């Protein structure tokens, strides 16, 4: 019997949290995945460390926030093949990945587009 949408979303969430812990060194405090047509949206909350939070708030120029954001995005881009493989192992073929993070809310959004709609 094929997995339900909810089961697949839970598996993706579990795999993404594991990736964050093992590759990035710290997991999110909250995570949720949504499968929407030909997209997978992953929302990770609580991803910024205390040290990064202090750096981000140390000056008003925004330089600390920019450094954190730039390094976090670069790290995720380097890990793109691993993330695509995680999804492939769960039965999805991701054709692109888009990401952004908010230092202010300590939240990352990852959007994967798939080769066809989920059904």
Could you describe each region identified by the protein language model?
Residues 1-119:
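Interaction-mediating elements
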């Amino acid at each position: 019997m094929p997995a339900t949408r909810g089961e697949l979303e839970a598996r993706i969430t579990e795999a993404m949290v594991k990736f964050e812990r093992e590759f990035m060194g710290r997991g999110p405090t909250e995570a949720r995945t949504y499968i929407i047509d030909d997209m997978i949206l992953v929302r990770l909350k609580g991803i910024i460390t205390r040290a990064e939070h202090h750096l981000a708030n140390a000056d008003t120029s925004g330089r600390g926030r920019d450094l954190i954001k730039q390094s976090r995005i670069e790290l995720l881009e380097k890990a793109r093949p691993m993330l695509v493989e995680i999804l492939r192992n769960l039965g999805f073929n991701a054709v692109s990945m888009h990401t952004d993070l908010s230092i202010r809310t300590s939240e990352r959004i990852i959007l994967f587009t798939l080769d066809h709609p989920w059904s």
